[in-house]
Amino acid sequence: MGKRLLDKLWERHVVTTNENGLDLLYIDLHLVHEVTSPQAFEGLRLTNRTVRRPDLTFATMDHNIPTKDVWNITDRIAKQQLDMLRENCKQFQVPLADIGDEEQGIVHVIGPELGLTQPGKTIVCGDSHTATHGAFGALAFGIGTSEVEHVLATQTLWQRKPKAMGIELKGKLQKGVYAKDIILHLLSKYGVAVGTGYVMEFYGETIGTMEMEERMTLCNMAIEGGAKAGIIAPDEKTFAYVKGRKYAPRDYETFEKKWFELYTDADAIYDLHISIDVTDLAPYVTWGTNPSMGVRIDEKLPEKHDVNDERAFSYMGLIPGQSTYDIPVQHVFIGSCTNSRLSDLEIAASVVKGRKVKEGVRALVVPGSKRVRDAAMQKGLHHIFEEAGFEWREPGCSMCLGMNPDQVPEGEHCASTSNRNFEGRQGKGARTHLVSPAMAAAAALYGHFVDIRKESYDGAISYS
């Protein structure tokens, strides 16, 4: 019987197996940020240990930093965590993309753009959306703080091998429908626990048509379905993306030959298989308090089915059967490790070019990294957004989570390109609606949700 992509990635990294069936995996890349690392570094100090492989470790500042005035850090805990990361990286000789550094940005944005993320690697980070890197054919997953310490000290991690889920995507997406809509559809149909105990492998003709940044969006939110990770077999698009980046292998051709072996064999069998035809898929909007509570833009909100629905409707200030078009939007956030890359900003800019943000709506665009910011500004995207009434910010996690100054006021609704809509995720009492960059941009113009498929934009920005 053939092997799945998961099998090939896993087997290449097993150091040993213990009596309980746990495998000790070698970790090829450890990404670090300021929130989940302080206790881990302190653990090294208390036990007089060093970081085993600083050269396989890379840190950045992203969660806590302000995006309006990056140096004006007024929150005491945030400043303490940022200062500690700077001190820890200096002491343990870990490379750091500090505030203001040209490589700084959201950890799951800078990994791929710097070429740190590569096919065949095992990648971990103290952040649940580490699955993003699986778009490159890497086995990438989030870990807890105690595990962060273990990897820092040993460059290994004890893990139980998950099962493999194959998610086949067939058909061609309509104009105005994106990878974000695919994953929101998957979650709305199968729920937030469908992937528990599995690694999701996305494959099929639809994947072949997707660019790398769309694939990253898919894998980024695999965790929202309960999966350990999301992976996609590397192909020519993957190799072209990695080639020439700062940390890409110098002996690139040798690595590329090995990467060509990373695919699921034709006779391999998944433990669970799901097939989705995306041809008639529509833009999605979440209405509730987890990512599975979503509907097509052309559907009405569902009826209450259980106490969770009742609580969600109450928290969100919505009613069953309400039209998605009637959901008010006071805030728009285009950013996060899900949708803050250059192509995301280009799509949003193509929607708002020459138009104005609705009076009373606050709209933010937060590039995922300094490099994304600079590339967007070279193309004049910041002028398009600012002329439309958006705020153009510095890189960071920003309004994705309520850990920095960018928050949504209590009781107000935000169209967000992020990945989670839990109660209080964007601030106390904030009401979050997950959408694609195109849908978020359109909501900023109208002050409510609209069907982006009916808007007169071409999905690609013209710089004339």
UniProtKB/Swiss-Prot annotation:
A biological process from GO = L-leucine biosynthetic process
Q: Which UniProt keywords apply?
A: 4Fe-4S, Amino-acid biosynthesis, Branched-chain amino acid biosynthesis, Iron, Iron-sulfur, Leucine biosynthesis, Lyase, Metal-binding
Q: Quick one: which pathway?
A: Amino-acid biosynthesis; L-leucine biosynthesis; L-leucine from 3-methyl-2-oxobutanoate: step 2/4
Query: What does the Swiss-Prot or TrEMBL cofactor note state?
Result: Binds 1 [4Fe-4S] cluster per subunit.
Q: Which residues bind [4Fe-4S] cluster?
A: C337, C397, C400
Q: Which InterPro entries match?
A: 3-IsopropMal_deHydase_lsu, Acnase/IPM_dHydase_lsu_aba_1/3, Acoase/IPM_deHydtase_lsu_aba, Aconitase_4Fe-4S_BS, Aconitase_4Fe-4S_dom, IPM_dehydratase_rel_enz, IPMI_cat
Q: How does it assemble?
A: Heterodimer of LeuC and LeuD.
> Protein name, please?
3-isopropylmalate dehydratase large subunit
Native organism: Bacillus cereus (strain AH820)
